Amino acid sequence: MWAMVKAGQVTAIYPRPKAITIDGIQHPAAIFTAWTKDQKKAIGIYDYSEVNANPNGRYYKQGTSETVVDDSAATVVKTWSNVAKDLADTGSKGDDNYSPGVKTEEKLKVKVQAAGLLQGSDWMAIRAAEGGTAVPSAVATYRAAVRTKSNSMETAIDNASDTAAVIALDTTTYHANGDINVVATLQDWPEVPDALK
């Protein structure tokens, strides 16, 4: 990306090359990629970048920004200071000002995942409850394990002390060779039994 700089101020941002007119002179889009940094600087075109521009929306909201124009390097850097979302809910459910916190959102995701994992065998549980064939042992064990895991995940979310702790629950770590070291707590679901594959 590039910025038009005049008198130390950014007057335009160009996310992609485009034909532009500067001081009455038309320049083709090719100047952005074909010209040297010094040639672009001579007409006020600086390299432009943003730092922390796209925070993980699950945990952060975009805060304020600071733009630094470096005339000697012909660069413009806009740095965003992202703000952690509230971990706890704000307001009360049903109120206009209610907003679910990060923990509520993460626990809802766990519930949805657990429901999805159980959905394929729900018919077996319903059939057994209505007096039909019993749920196969491996499937019953799996269903219980999914519910237990879901409950332990929600407890882990509730026990997280800050945003970094919540993020850590959903972060798998890897060895240098790319193999999994530790599966993230919120991704460590029971193995699906053969009867459901």
Q: Which residue stretches match the model-derived regions?
A:
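A preference for well-ordered globular domain cores
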Residues: M1-K197
